Amino acid sequence: MTDPVRLTRYARGGGCACKIPPGELEKMVAGLGPATGTSDLLVGLDHGDDAAVVRLDERTGLVTTADFFTPVVDDAYDWGRIAATNALSDVYAMGGTPLVALNLLCWPRDVLPLELAREVLRGGQDVARDAGCHLAGGHSVDDEGPKYGLAVTGVVRPEELITLDAGRAGLPLSLTKPLGVGVLNTRHKATGESFPEAVAAMTTLNRDAARAAVAAGVRCGTDVTGFGLLGHASKLARASRLTVAIDAARVPYLAGAREAVRDGYVSGGSRRNLEWVAGWTDFGGIAEDDRLLLADAQTSGGLLVAGELPGATVVGELLPPGEHRVVVR
């Protein structure tokens, strides 16, 4: 009997932790503006928002994004679901609705069976169907390692757009999913242990949270993915020219996350996140393990929004600009 294929063995990094480190990425894209200057580009590279937005008319903006990554779990179908959920989240994070998506697949065809690739695509298809988003083809590359995700196009009303730079001092900050999938995925890759709660979190669409945010009049927010809560909070603070305060005791975590950090299952991406934010973060004396959890590279994480939402956890607030971008209390 053939042993089941462990897809995570073919990944250098895992999920959103395989991103180019944030500091290096910002240097790489510095000074790169739009190919053609136009007032119809509502959101571009300026602040590193979750997607680009172009105005089609007074009532409609076109939202476009792409997101793909290496396996975070060994099950091909679940990986496809997670990657698709994560890609769709970028549109939801902008307050938009995804309409159509294309598969982005890299596959080592001489190493891994094509039947597994089909399972990955099936997972993405099922999530897109649940989201009411057309999945219409895509592009594939014969590559050394497996990677999968989606290019997604959606729409948003310009007056309902959620961006990083629209924060106001005094607003609460709410988080719609618990943290910890990064350290749990790292443990899964190392030991083969399964964490169903983490898979459930990563395959939960941010659709309902985004709808609640739009209904509540939220205009500032992002999703929490590869740069961790601290990294994404820092980007929001910088774009809005404010300070973000995070109440460490209020931040929710998945079961087993603290134990995973204690046992050393921390990805290189999470450690790089912590190094990146250290220069402009007041950690308030919290322990190293807590710092690592707040910097944990999430895959298909929740929304972080300036406002209160039903079912979300208030984890902090926006303050007038101070000495630090982020203050942990």
Label for each model-derived stretch:
Residues 52-63, 203-209, 274-284:
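Acidic-glycine-rich active-site phosphate/pyrophosphate-binding loop
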